[in-house]
């Protein structure tokens, strides 16, 4: 009920228009550009090491029902509207065929039976990848290089849970799932240039193209990046396996190599078989109806991908 009231209050609200195609905090971005990667990593770890990541009572796992998927998508829509790159729609969520594909896994962070964070792993398919709409040539080049591709998308965290390690734990679950269960070799992501330094210097993503405006997201700027998952563990070990780069998770000391590649966390619950939740035709149609989308508005290719044709 509270969510419905919030949606109706904000329904139709135009995104905040940021000067030009987007607002970049030039001073911050310019400063980060000149920070050496090793120093950037030390500063980042120092910041998160101030407090132990408190994940007690949290659960991080793939969605298990259509209700959970839709709650995650509502959280994404709220987050995008708050950032000014989308409007709040009547349903509180926007339809995307990518989230219903057999190769897509949507992860959620759950606390007190509420979904407070989400991120999705979208594997390459007959529909391609979402970032191809803006960075088509870059994705084609990655395909030509061979290997299994997937895109990281729709990261969102509820307002009261930012700064508590929720994104790191979601990424932990998603990385392990992609590497060990789905055989993904390269992760692609499109981020705002403001976040580029974090992904390059901390998670070792590499730029694969130029910054472009993302038309569907109020012309927000989009930087395409790629991470070679096959080499990531060795890179993380070399960069992070040292005492000066440690931090705590629930009072236990760790570092990013151990955190992402070795330690197991009971709060992260991944299906042992590596199977992805498949949505049947009735669930797909139900979700479309809730989003105000009719089957006749979908292309034949999308209908085939969703097993509706």
Protein language model regions, located:
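Acyl-donor binding region in acyl/amide transferases
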Residues: 129-232
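Intrinsically disordered, low-structural-confidence terminal and linker regions
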Residues: 1-19
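Short, His- and charge-rich active-site/binding loops that engage polyanionic ligands
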Residues: 108-142
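Conserved N-terminal entry element of GNAT/NAT acetyltransferase domains
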Residues: 16-66
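Short, solvent-exposed loop/turn elements at beta->coil junctions and helix N-caps
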Residues: 91-98, 211-215
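Short amphipathic alpha-helix that is part of the acyltransferase structural core
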Residues: 45-96, 106-110, 115-116, 308
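C-terminal non-catalytic accessory extensions
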Residues: 281-309
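Charge-rich, low-complexity intrinsically disordered segments
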Residues: 219-292
